[in-house]
Amino acid sequence: TMWNVAVERQIQVKGPDAEKFVDYVITRDATKISPMRARYVILCNAYGGVLNDPILLRISKDEFWFSLSDSDIGMYLQGVNADGKFNCTIEEIDACPVQIQGPKSKALMKDLCGDQVDFDNMPFYGLAEVKIAGRSCVISQSGFSGEAGYEIYLRNATLYAEDMWNAVLEAGKKHKLMVIAPAHHRRIQAGILSWGQDMDMQHNPYQCNLGYQVSLSGKGEWNKKADYVGKAALE
């Protein structure tokens, strides 16, 4: 299935202090996220309330995208850096995604992208830069279904959305691709939360099964020593 999730907004954080800034606003350790990898993250307010739970894409050493469908996180992030303490830009960019989900998603993506990406060895939450119908896209192995799947983020989406859309439809013909709206019953079955429906800023991570996102005494990305918004309330 192809899901039209163009409602998801991409907030770009870019510049020399991008990593430092992102690490300050999320609960897990951003310094341990490699370029061309993504992660599911949460942002909390000073009281520990969950402000949003976006997918964070690390496009390069100094560039991150917060991919979110609800709330005004873009304005929040700009407010956090209103004093210019962090040397980075924060803006919503013209990049919109569609999701290819289901057991045939890998086969479809191979037909769509050819040898641009080694899909057999692409890790979960791995990213890749590709051209689709000659247009620049970022692909992530992720989705909202709990099944195998991918997200295609089209750059300059207001100009080239139709080109990418038609290319996916053409590649999907032999796979019997169906275009649907986001299937919430699938994400509910998979235990995937939706901010604004399952939790909001009135809930802390421990109240909605997201306590693992808080760095306490864990390892790796959970062994975070740096300060972050909400740390005093959560730890």
Question: Where does each model-flagged region fall?
Answer:
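Detector for glycine-centered tight turns/loop "hinges" at secondary-structure junctions
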Residues: Y47-G48, G134
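Acidic, proline/glycine-enriched N-terminal capping motif
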Residues: T1-L43, G49
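Conserved, structured C-terminal
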Residues: L57-E235
